[in-house]
Swiss-Prot record:
Expressed in a range of tissues including cerebrum, cerebellum, retina, cochlea, lung, liver and heart. Also expressed in the apical, medial and basal portions of the basillar papilla. This is Transmembrane channel-like protein 3. One of its GO terms (cellular component) is plasma membrane. Belongs to the TMC family. It comes from Gallus gallus (Chicken). Keywords: Glycoprotein, Membrane, Transmembrane, Transmembrane helix.
């Protein structure tokens, strides 16, 4: 049976590195070409060999490729493979030979240095990421949910840094450097009455005095269109920077959300192999710090806890009616809380305005009651929401999102109620400014001491001080109105106090300061002092304070995240009226980072329900985007609705704040540009542009929906495939396929047609394996690891196809099988006869055919087809231990030279080169002489395969050239078992005796492993080193022959243990006789000698190489070069079931 010529390159072999290739070149005269296990082409190896940038390695690779090109004719490869390797070698030489020049070498060295510099620079920049190690430490102990808060805080810190640079560089610094100095104008001068209390704590706390007339607020900036020698347009810059703050915030938020969305779509789902990935792939082997290792271990434990909670939440059963009722009650309570908080804030703001109108001097509480009440509601309400959320019984992540949404609504309600009350105050101040402007006009037309007579119609009586005379007397002006009479009494110098933009900025900054104070107080009271009480009073208290009330504090993710959103909303809302508010927020966030991180690591404990946070944190960003939009609306409304103050600010004298843009275009730009801007801002252009934008948004949204749908379909497909793989693995693990197969079907599969390149599946259909990938695909499953009762077939398969496989399957045959059924002695001359074809089923029996088929090698028949077909069903083999721990030594491959065949007799192992590629089964009857060449049956089905043999060494008769075996160092167990001690004792007994090889007929049968590439070859079951006699091999006489290799089967224990027999030297003319007497000069049955005739084997041989030419005799096989041995991987040892 001859294999196809291309099958030699089909099976994948173990990959070798470039270094191993070069070592093989030095120690061998012919270079072997092997492919990596997962590659079917030679390009990967060539690129791997030639990709090195080292000139020395490039030179060695080029020399190697040139040697390959020169010796390509001598290699036993198919022509297609030779042409492919030759073409690739030429390409590599042409591509990399130019690198050996001096210029190319300098360029390569410079490029390598530049890459190293960039890598070092990147590592250096990473060191400057703020608070990275602190956040990693928190994440390792408290999980990704708590760490997401600090990551979000750091990101907000970066945004505020940019906002501070924008306002500072374009607004604050130009005003300080080129604007009017302090005290030069009315808006920058403190009244004489206020100088006495300007430095009092009460005044500073209310942001009055010197703070009011500083760059912190809007009123300090001058209204000059151009300042300094360069003519810097400060009013225009103030307006554009105010708008740029909102634009930049929108852009950076949307960009971050888009990036996170792409990352979440590109990332794999964590629902598959959750615990395996965390258990086996989570450790970072680059950790060299004990503290970092401890943090990483804590992080792995936390991630496993998160995964366990995820699985528990999926399986939790719920009562639908009770759950819906509780959720309705919880939402009603939340709505009542929100309504009450909004009413309280509006009530406090209205009361504060009345007190300001009625009382001349306000107390400290009356000045700050609005900010204090807002901060108290902000601190208390989230805890109430958390108690309500416990009724809903949502998943922890869903609970967090509901909690975030409710707290967000609370904060927005607080801010909007505050801003509405402030806008009412702004409206009244705008009315006062209008009255003051009317008074100025009328005062210019009449003497200052004149008193107007009120008319009979409704009049507006206003008492306004004369700012020009700086006196305390009041002048009554009668102004006709269509409404009611309003009396507004203003103190002296009221024009300076009626700057509503400064008032809004003061309220926002005051609210931020008080919020920071309450945050620090809550951390100290709720976390620190609470932790101290629990820690030191738990021993002397009536109950356990750690497990019951008050317990240690837990880090509330929803409350703290929304607090950051609320704080940033205040900054956006007041940034236009207080340019230094982002700078203050930077300092606040720095303090909050250190204080919160210290409190978490010192005072808090991890949440009882640790859960995984969202990987992208897009929910946080979506809330922040929503807050940005809602906080931008009041500012835009105030800019568009109210007239700017007349006596303060850069827009004084303008009808609207945004008029500064049109004024600048009219005065500072040419006329054609003004006309273009007017045309672009007309409805003729604006409306079509808006329609086009809407259509574009709809189109992009449609594409996004379709891509999202496709992504979900692909994700479901991947998940389905993984589920199928899991099912297959489970079925293979329990041996479901093998258990369900009846015995007669197994026998019919063992007796298929003997075509080497075809195999028949269980459904009867013939299938030809693929030339390249068939072997790998056929070997890719893992079978049952325990013996089955319907046949002693142990199936262990490696996922990678190996070059040579031998599998032995044992079964019990009846005692009445006559010895005449066994084949006759070997006839070394091929004859023309039909091959041994076993019957296709158990019921069909035929006579054994002892003749040879032409073009077939002489081999030994281990049994006949009739014996196989007449056997009883499989009987289980009793193992005392599993076949799991089979120790073997590393695989060493050396060149082998020819030695004298009679140097050590026939017992010495004989090795030949690679054998033909085919799958062959040999029926082995243990105590019967092997006389006839076996005929190959077809390849076994995948469910009947056994683990690949551990080591494969081929032994051949004396008429073939033989090579000497060098003994490796054996691996002994530090605690030998009783059987091993008996073997060692018997070994010491052998040392005292002569080391002359004995006849096999004098030895007791021993358990053997049938591993080999040919049926007529002798088999060694040990890992061996090969060394030629000329290289200095010396026989170790201190060890008995049986101890040259000791196979440690820790989990395999046969019914009886025997020593391996010594092999007696034979001459060439005694070959046939030795084969008859000693069962092919190798091994007898491994069971009891009395029942050894009942043991029958099917020896399965997979060989990768091509057949030799027809008619070639092994006795005339010459080897002019060193022969490469067919060795298997170290994980291919198979124990035969006896």
């Amino acid at each position: 049976m001859e294999a196809a010529p291309g099958t030699a390159a089909a099976a994948a072999k173990p990959a070798k590195s470039c270094k191993k290739y070069r070592m093989g070149k030095r120690h061998a005269n012919i270079y072997t070409y092997q492919e990596p296990p997962h590659s079917n082409s030679d390009e990967d190896i060539s690129e791997e060999k030639a990709d090195s940038q080292d000139p020395e390695q490039v030179f060695q690779n080029i020399q190697y490729q040139k040697e390959v090109m020169s010796n390509i004719r001598c290699r036993p490869w198919p022509m297609r493979q030779k042409l492919r390797v030759l073409r690739q070698a030429k390409e590599i030489v042409l591509k990399y030979e130019g690198r050996l020049t001096r210029t190319r070498g300098y360029q390569a060295a410079g490029a390598e240095l530049w890459r190293k510099f960039l890598r070092l620079a990147y590592n250096f920049v990473v060191l400057f990421i703020p608070w990275e190690m602190r956040i990693k430490k928190i994440e390792s102990h408290f999980g990704s949910g708590v760490a997401s808060y600090f990551i979000f805080l750091r990101w907000l810190f970066g945004i505020n840094i940019v906002l501070t640079i924008m306002t500072g560089a374009f607004v604050v610094l130009p005003e300080l450097l080129a604007g009017a100095p302090f005290g030069s104008t009315v808006s920058k001068t403190i009244r004489q009455e206020d100088l006495k209390t300007a430095q009092d704590l009460d005044t500073i706390w209310s942001l009055g005095g010197y703070l009011q007339y500083s760059v912190l607020f809007y009123g300090y900036y001058g209204s000059d269109r151009k300042i300094g020698k360069a003519g810097y347009r400060l009013p225009l810059a103030y307006f554009l920077v105010g708008m740029a703050v909102f634009a930049y915030s929108f852009i950076i938020l949307l960009k971050k959300m888009a990036k996170n969305s792409r990352m979440s779509l590109a990332s794999a789902s964590d629902e598959n192999y959750t615990f395996c990935w965390r258990l086996f792939c989570a450790w970072d082997y680059l950790i060299g710090n004990p503290e970092a290792a401890e943090s990483k271990a804590a992080a792995i434990v936390n991630s496993i806890r998160e995964a366990i909670l995820e699985e528990q939440e999926k399986k939790k059963s719920k009562n639908l009616a009770v759950t819906i009722s509780l959720r309705i009650i919880a939402n009603i309570l939340v709505l009542l809380s929100l309504t009450g908080s909004i009413y309280i804030i509006y009530f406090v703001v209205d009361r504060s305005q009345k007190l300001e109108n009625n009382k001349r001097e306000l107390t400290l509480w009356e000045k700050n009651e609005v900010s204090v009440v807002v901060s108290l509601i902000t601190m208390i309400a989230p805890s109430a929401f958390e108690l309500v959320a416990a009724l809903e019984m949502y998943h922890p992540r869903t609970t967090l999102r509901f909690q975030l949404a409710r707290v967000l609504v609370l904060y927005l309600g607080n801010l909007y109620s505050l801003i509405i009350a402030l806008l009412d105050k702004v409206n009244s101040m705008s009315v006062t400014n209008s009255i003051y402007s009317i008074y100025q006009v009328s005062n210019n037309s009449t003497p200052s001491s004149a008193t107007g007579t009120p008319a009979k119609e409704d009049t507006l009586s206003a008492t306004i001080s004369d700012a020009q005379m700086n006196s305390s007397e009041s002048h009554a002006q009668s102004l006709p109105t269509a409404g009611s009479l309003v009396n507004n009494t203003a103190s002296s110098n009221s024009a300076q106090n009626q700057c509503w933009e400064t008032y809004v900025g003061q309220e926002m900054l005051k609210l931020s300061i008080i919020d920071m104070i309450f945050t620090v107080a809550s951390i100290l009271l709720i976390d620190f002092f609470r932790g101290l009480c629990v820690r030191y009073l738990s021993d002397c208290w009536c109950w356990d304070l750690e497990s019951k009330f008050p317990e240690y504090g837990e880090f509330k993710i929803a409350e703290n995240v929304l607090h950051l959103v609320y704080n940033q909303g205040m900054i956006w809302m007041g940034a236009f009226f207080s340019p230094c508010l982002p700078a203050f927020n930077v300092l606040k966030l720095i303090g909050l980072m250190y204080l919160r991180s210290w409190a978490v690591l010192t005072c808090n404990v991890p949440h009882q329900q640790v859960f995984r946070a969202s990987r992208s944190n897009n929910f946080y960003l979506a809330m922040l985007l929503f807050m940005l939009f809602l906080c931008m609306l009041p500012t835009i409304f105030a800019i568009a609705r109210y007239k700017p103050s007349l006596s303060c600010g850069p827009f004084s004298g303008q009808e609207k704040i945004y008029d500064i843009v049109s004024e600048t275009i009219q005065n500072d730009f040419p006329a054609w540009f003004n006309s273009v801007i007017a045309y672009i801002s007309s409805p003729v252009v604006v409306l079509p542009a808006l329609l086009l934008l809407f259509m574009l948004i709809y189109y992009l949204q449609s594409i996004a929906r379709s891509l999202k749908f496709t992504n979900n379909q692909l994700r479901m497909k991947i998940q389905a495939e993984r589920t199928e793989d899991k099912k297959k693995v489970v079925q293979m693990a329990v041996g479901q396929n093998l258990v369900d197969i009846p015995d007669d079907q197994i026998m019919s599969d063992f007796t298929q047609n003997s075509e080497g390149t075809r195999f028949q599946s269980l459904d009867g259909s013939d299938k030809r394996p693929d030339k390249d990938g068939g072997l790998i695909s056929q070997e890719s499953s893992v079978r049952a690891s325990t013996p089955r009762k319907n046949g002693s077939v142990l199936n262990f398969e490696s996922p990678v196809s190996k070059g040579t496989r031998i599998q032995t399957i044992s079964q019990t045959v009846p005692h009445a099988v006559p010895s005449t059924d066994v084949a006759r002695p070997v006839n070394t001359t091929p004859t023309t006869s039909a091959s041994l074809t076993p019957a296709p089923s158990v019921s069909s029996a035929q006579k054994p055919r002892n003749d040879h088929t032409t073009n077939r090698y002489p081999s030994v028949v281990h049994g006949s087809a009739s014996e196989l077909c007449k056997t009883k069903p499989y009987t289980p083999v009793t193992f005392k231990k599993r076949i799991g721990d089979v120790h073997s030594e590393p695989l060493f491959r050396k060149s082998i030279r020819q030695v004298n065949p009679d140097a050590f007799g026939a017992g010495a192992p004989v090795f030949v080169g690679r054998r033909p590629h085919a799958t062959r089964y040999f029926i082995v009857n243990e105590n019967e002489p092997r006389k006839k060449s076996a005929r190959s049956t077809s390849r076994l089905q995948r469910q009947f395969r056994i683990e690949e043999p551990e080591d494969i060494v081929e032994l051949y008769p004396c008429n073939v050239r033989r090579y000497v075996v060098q003994t490796p160092q054996c691996m002994y167990s530090p605690h030998p078992s009783e059987d091993e001690e008996d073997e060692e004792a018997l070994g010491r007994h052998y040392v005292k005796r002569s080391h002359r090889p004995r006849s096999l007929s004098d030895l007791r049968p021993a358990p053997r492993f049938y591993i080999g590439d040919r049926a007529d070859g002798h088999v060694l079951t040990s890992k061996v080193h090969y060394k030629s006699w000329d290289d200095g091999f010396e026989l170790d006489l201190d060890r008995p022959p049986y101890a040259y290799k000791k196979v440690h089967l820790k989990n395999v224990e046969a019914d009886q243990h025997y020593l391996e027999p010594q092999v007696k030297p034979k001459t060439k003319h005694m070959l046939e006789q030795s084969l008859t007497e000693s069962d092919s000069v190798s091994i007898e049955s491994s069971s009891d000698p009395q029942n050894s005739s009942n043991d029958q084997y099917i020896q399965v041989i997979h060989s990768k190489e091509k057949y030799l030419k027809p008619g070639t005799k092994l006795t005339k096989k010459k080897s002019n070069t060193n022969i490469e041995l067919n060795m298997s991987e170290p994980n291919e040892l198979v124990c035969s079931n006896v």
